[in-house]
A protein has these predicted regions:
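C-terminal scaffold of the Radical SAM
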Residues: 3-10, 29-51, 57-333
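Short amphipathic alpha-helical interaction segments
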Residues: 333-343
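Local cysteine-cluster metal-coordination motifs and their immediate loop/turn environment
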Residues: 14-29
Length: 343
């Protein structure tokens, strides 16, 4: 598969399985059934090998879900070994999402031995009432234990996912989370605002009056306090929802925000290559049956107006602002000529 010379192709690997669905989650996920999971990993390996044989060579790998760390040790090893053997040349970053309740010392050691250099933990909050409301399966202490393991085993780069704006959250909850971040000392933080997506438990409860979201003004105040506290700890904000203290930005996600090329493998995974956008059909059983050649759906070539809109929307998420040279290269247009009067 041909990739633009100036592109920074990323590989996203989707592992859709979860023991239970979090109350805010609207991602493509499936129940964790051992036989199905093993068959899925086998199909995933076939798809990965197909792209490797075709010449695809990513600069970054990101394994997300779902819950990648919920894989058995055998399936975890098979998947990571396939990726390690397929994509060694030119790889700059390899991240795996890990949930605190399902990652352990053995899986971490296997990942490090095969080339993984970045682990991202879905903590969301260190307040037990918040964890229960969000449907998380771990407690706050487990996140501390996992990051102690990361330090013990020498994980090169670590990241922590947190959520701000959950019902009932107040400034003391933010301070609890900030104190935990200071103690854990991760290299990177992703701080997301809670959203009530249609089809989720939280959305349903809000519509039925079963819970009361916090007011927008309160959410903004909490977010500002959170960001200020992180910056006082030495974190530098480089994107709307992301900060780092050491180790730099997430290269894989930075590629998304720069509208770079990426290939998605697995059920429901999205791709953007050579100006074409598509995703694999989000159906685990059909993905398994396809044997490494999944059906592509939602295939489209963005029109110029969509390209312009995407570039502006994505790059304005970055604190550095827009790259006007990139804008002209991608669109053939001069940004100042088309937008100057509006600035």
């Amino acid at each position: 598969m041909k990739v633009k010379p100036e592109g920074s192709p990323g590989l996203y690997v989707h592992v859709p399985f979860c023991r239970s669905r979090c109350t805010y989650c609207d991602f493509h996920v499936a129940a964790l059934r051992p036989g199905v999971v093993t068959d899925y990993v086998s199909a995933l390996i076939l798809e990965i090998q197909h792209h490797a044989d075709a010449g695809f060579s990513p600069e970054t790998i990101f394994i997300g879900g779902g819950t990648p760390s919920a894989l058995s040790v055998e399936d975890w090893t098979r998947l990571l070994k396939c990726l390690s053997e397929s994509f060694q040349s030119g790889l700059k970053e390899w991240t795996i999402e890990a949930n605190p309740e399902s990652i352990d010392e053995q899986k971490i050691e296997i990942a490090l031995s095969l080339g993984v250099d970045r682990l991202s933990t879905g903590a969301q909050t260190f307040v037990e009432t918040g964890l229960a409301l969000l449907g998380r399966r771990h407690d706050a202490q487990r996140v501390h234990e996992v990051h102690d393991l990361f330090q013990k085993l020498g994980v090169p780069r670590t990241s922590l996912d947190l959520i701000v704006g959950w019902p009932g959250q107040a400034i003391d909850s933010v301070n609890t989370d900030l104190a935990a971040v200071k103690e854990i000392d991760p290299d990177h933080i992703s701080l997301y605002h809670l959203s009530y997506e249609q089809g989720t438990w939280l959305h349903s409860m809000r519509e039925r009056g079963g819970l009361k979201p916090i007011m927008d003004d309160t959410c903004i105040e909490l977010s500002r306090a959170f960001l200020q506290g992180l910056q006082e700890q030495g974190f530098e904000r480089y994107e709307v929802s992301n900060l780092y203290a050491r180790g730099g930005a997430s290269l894989h996600n930075l590629n998304y925000w720069e509208r770079g090329e990426y290939l998605g493998v697995g059920s429901g995974a999205a791709s953007f290559m050579e100006g074409l956008r598509w995703k694999n059909k989000p159906d685990v059983q059909k993905y398994i049956s396809a044997g490494g050649s999944p059906e592509k759906v939602s295939i489209e070539t963005p029109e110029l107006l969509e390209v312009v809109t995407e570039l502006i929307m994505l790059e304005l998420r970055l604190t550095r602002g827009m790259n006007l040279n990139r804008f002209k290269t991608e669109t053939g247009l001069d940004f100042h000529e088309i937008c100057g009067e509006s600035l």
